[in-house]
Amino acid sequence: NKNIDSVHATDKDRDDDDDDDDVEAINRWYRFDSDDEIVDDGRLPSSSVSWKSGFVIDESSKPFFISSKTANETLKCGAAIAFLKNACKDEKWGDVSRTILKHFDEFFASLSKSTASTAFTSDDENNFEKLVKMLPDIISNAKRVADSAVRESLFEHYRLKAHFVALKQYLLLGQGDFIHALMESIHDELDKEIDPMSREGISQYSLRGNLDAAVRVSNACLADQHVIDALSVRLMKPLEDETGWDVFSLEYKLRAPLTTIFSDREMGRYSRAFTFLWKLKRAEYTLCELWKAMKPTVSSRFQREGLGGNIGKALEVEQARCHRVRQSMHALISDVQYYVMFEVLEPSWNEFECKLSHNAANDDLDSIIAGHENYLNSVIEKALLGTKSQVLQRSLQLIFDSVQKFKSHTFKLYEAIEDASRVRKSDQRRILEREMNQQWGVDFGESKEGEDYLSEDFVTGAKESLDSIENEFQKHVDGFLKLLPLQTHVDTSFLSFRLEATFRQGA
């Protein structure tokens, strides 16, 4: 290319040769038949591998009379064709180039009755001025043609919209039946502790089988096969005393050209959101499982089977307290979950989807990438996962820990009651059999009041343990409620109102 220096080319010292040089510069700077020529012209580096950083303007080769805006549109037009050819492997890139060049030729031909190359070297200054004036519109039209081809390739051939939806459904837990089925099938495996050195204790092969089972029994089985193939499981590096719950994550694997939009950075943010939502879902699932163990029919059965007396009355009190604590925990988890799912995820998605639909005809790849980044920014910030909400996030984690401690306490309590009930029932059968055989009297440990089946020390220990968990949970809730109004960068007013109404009554 002939480089044009704006310092030496002023309106006063221009001559006919300069005009010829200028139009020839336009000819060479804009006319290209492939991305290889773009690279040779110096506008794109030959080592470009990234859409954002791989395409740059070589100012030394840009004609001085080309504005920055027009030059940038030229760059994006060429970059779009290069992306179509190299990343999308779309054979239509040649047709797009020829269509653009045809528009150029038609315009240049309209300037002169001669051929396009003659128009470029014409001595008619009016033609040159007209060319410079109308060039931005020509380039804009060329860019629209290239952008349209890129959009068509991404959305129709590579099913970009389907992948946006899949990430919302699976990594952002929008597909409720699938997530519940996955939780049902996977929780036993994730309860296992992991050796930090060998990573033994949990099988990724088993987790993959659980994932496939959850897909089969849910509506996820109706998804396109390319979506199912992209869904996988990942185990992060475990730390000391961690279980499968701490290292498990769903993963969505994509390849070029989709990785231009779903970069490592963006997929990391999806993973971050999944980790939080998975913990929230686990807490909800845990509390629902506890309700099954604690429901009134279980308590009444214990009474029918003879765990009466002072021990029985003390257990009744503890069972009632367990119900109250579980109800408080469930109220908080449900409110937070409602906020995240219906006040954060759904509105953010609806806004993003609306922009995809309404601006589809005008969006270039940069607009799609920016729209997706804004969508994830909204999710991360409003879901209280941003850098400004780190203290609040730690407070929520302490609440999640309290839920798991309560689960451990409650299951131990009810297992002990179940064991005592079984022993009591077995003793009652033996007593009945001896009475039928006219063998009167009872052995030690067969008291009909049940005091010998569960000791007072056990009941006292259970009470103290529940006291500690309840106080700890309330402390964390108080801290969370104090921190929530400080999140001025997001609107948490409705969440604060609901939680205040639940936990500040009678305070």
Question: Predicted regions span which residues?
Answer:
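Extended, charged interaction scaffolds in large complex subunits
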Residues: 1-507
